[in-house]
Regions:
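Conserved ABC ATPase signature
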Residues: 126-130, 134
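Helix-to-loop junction immediately C-terminal to a conserved catalytic motif
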Residues: 50
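Conserved ABC ATPase "signature" region
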Residues: 104-122
Length: 235
């Protein structure tokens, strides 16, 4: 289904343009991170690419498949975990049942991802009583179990302590190594250094740079991107 081609994308609310003429193309293999200051339009762009929002102008095109087929090949994890009032295991198995996976296969897939994410010992516990880091690992495990070609992540480690963040990043690395394309929003340049292959930099709804992560961090071209990398405040 890749590459993903975004052309002339705009998004407005009550005549205020939150994204303006955004264009880029993403290949199948790199981990792509969308970065920028608060209010830059990062999460909106992610939701449009996933099909949760419709653009005001422009197009989002995948290489192949109908809209339904494209959505079946994607998964998304939000900053705040969305969990059912069920056990951790049941949360994973239910997502698989919705996708039409047979019960036996769903159990086996759930076993694999719960083990890989370090959640086997607490798989029987109600999902909503888990810690914040455990809940976020669970929603990542649930998404991974779907075997997405593309996994969208909206600041999955926001507000977590360093140990929980490291666990989340380990899962992201595993999902990437298993073959999923990662498209992730973050404000954390440390995460960019540790995980990203490619960076899209947004500022005030405009895409100012698309570059390899090392080039972006060391040699950002725009004044705004350089200021962001240096830790200056942007608005």
């Amino acid at each position: 289904m890749l590459p993903l081609v975004v052309d002339g994308l705009g998004f407005s609310v009550r005549e205020q343009w939150l994204l303006k003429d955004v264009s880029f193309s993403l290949g199948a293999h790199d981990r792509t991170f969308i970065v920028g200051p608060n209010g830059a339009g990062k999460s909106i762009l992610l939701k449009i690419c996933h099909g949760l929002l419709s653009p005001t102008t422009g197009t989002v095109r995948w290489a192949s498949g109908s809209f339904r087929e494209q959505r079946q090949r994607q998964a998304m994890v939000f900053q705040k975990p969305v969990l059912l009032r069920r056990s951790a295991r049941a949360n994973v198995e239910y997502a698989l049942s919705v996708r039409g996976v047979a019960k036996k296969d769903a159990r086996e897939r759930a076993d694999r991802v719960l083990e890989a994410t370090g959640l086997t010992a607490i798989a029987h516990r109600p999902a909503r009583v888990l810690s914040g880091g455990e809940q976020q690992r669970l929603v990542l495990a649930r998404a991974w179990a779907l075997r997405p070609q593309v996994l969208f992540l909206d600041e999955p480690a926001a507000h977590l302590d360093p140990a929980a963040t490291a666990a989340i990043e380990d899962v992201i690395q595993q999902v990437s190594n298993a073959g999923s394309k990662i498209i992730m929003v973050t404000h954390d340049l440390g995460q960019v250094r540790r995980l990203a292959d490619e960076v899209l930099f947004l500022h005030q709804g405009q895409l100012l740079e698309q570059a390899a992560s090392g080039d972006f961090l060391a040699h950002a071209k725009s004044q705004e991107a350089r200021a962001f990398v240096e830790g200056q405040l942007l608005w």
